[in-house]
UniProtKB/Swiss-Prot annotation:
The lineage of its organism: Bacteria, Pseudomonadati, Pseudomonadota, Betaproteobacteria, Neisseriales. PANTHER family: HPR KINASE_PHOSPHORYLASE, PROTEIN YJDM-RELATED. This is HPr kinase/phosphorylase. Belongs to the HPrK/P family. GO terms for biological process: regulation of carbohydrate metabolic process. Pfam families: Hpr_kinase_C, Hpr_kinase_N. Its EC number is 2.7.11.-, 2.7.4.-. CDD domains: HprK_C.
Amino acid sequence: MPSISVRRLFDDNQYKLQLAWAAGNSGADNRIGVEADKPVLALVGHLNFIHPNQIQVVGLAESEYLNRLESGETGYQFGDLFDISMSLVIVANDLPVSPGLRDYCHKNDIPLLTSKLESPYLMDVLRIYLQRTLAASSVKHGVFLDVFEIGVLITGHSGLGKSELALELISRGHSLIADDAVELFRIGPETLEGRCSPMLRDFLEVRGLGILNIRHIFGETSIRPKKILQLIINLVEADDEYMKQLDRLSIRTETESILNVNVRSVTLPVAVGRNLAVLVEAAVRNYILQLRGKDSTREFLERHQTQLKENEQNHENRPD
C-alpha cells in the first residue's frame, strides 16, 4: 500500500497550512498510508478515541475536552485514552498546546504539529493532498499533451515520430506535460491524472535535435504541470495493405484500461504523406463533439439509411 512520511507531509504543506513543530520530532519518519478497509478520506479526522484516524486533528471542542482531561474532571488519564495507533496529531485554530498532550507525544515519538488555520479547512486540504499523493499509479511510455484543453497521451512503438508530432503540436499552440515516461495517478474512481517527473519536466527529446527545453523555446504557456487523461492516440505503422483493410466506417468505441480506468482511445496509422498533427487535432475535436452527444459517423449512417428509405419509397410510388 502506498504511504508517505510525516516529514514529507510537513515539507509539502508547511507554508500552505502554516504548520509548525510542537513535539515528537523523533517521529518524523512515521508513515501515513492507505489501509485496506479504509478510504484515503478516512485518514484525517477530528480527535477520536473510538475510531482513531492516522492523522488526529484537535479543534476547539477537542481542545476543551483535553483541558478537562488534564484537570482530572473526566476521571481518565492521557495514557488511558491515547493508547491508540496514530501517526500524527495537529492542533488547529492557533490553539495553545496542552502540556499533557505535548509530553505524551514527546514520550511516544508521535509528531505533534500546530496550525493557525481552522480545523475543517485544514482537514479538507489534507484529504485532497493525501488523495493525490497516495493514489495508485503507473508509468506509461509516450508523450502527454494538452490539446484543446483535453489531456492526450500519444503512444506507439519507438521510431514512429511521437516526439516530432508533439513538437509540431506545441508549435501550433498546444502544451507539453510529459515526455517519454508519463506518470499516471488514479485520483478518483474513473479519473486518471498525468504528471511529469521532476527530472524530465520541461524537456522533449527529438531524434536529430537532442533534448530540447520546451519552456525556454516556446515560453511558459507551452508547459503544463498536470492534466486529466481523457484520450489516448496510438500510432501504428501502416503499409498499403494495412490501409486497404482499415475499417473506414467503424462505429466501435475503442478504450484502453489503465489502473482499472477505461480511457477512450483512437488508432492513427502512420504513413507517408499523412499530416499527423492535423489528424490529432481533428481526433480531439471529434472527441469533444462526442462528449456533447454528437457522433459524425452515426449521423452519416443515419442520413444514409434515411436516403435509402426515401429512394425505395420513390421507386415504389413511381408509375410503371
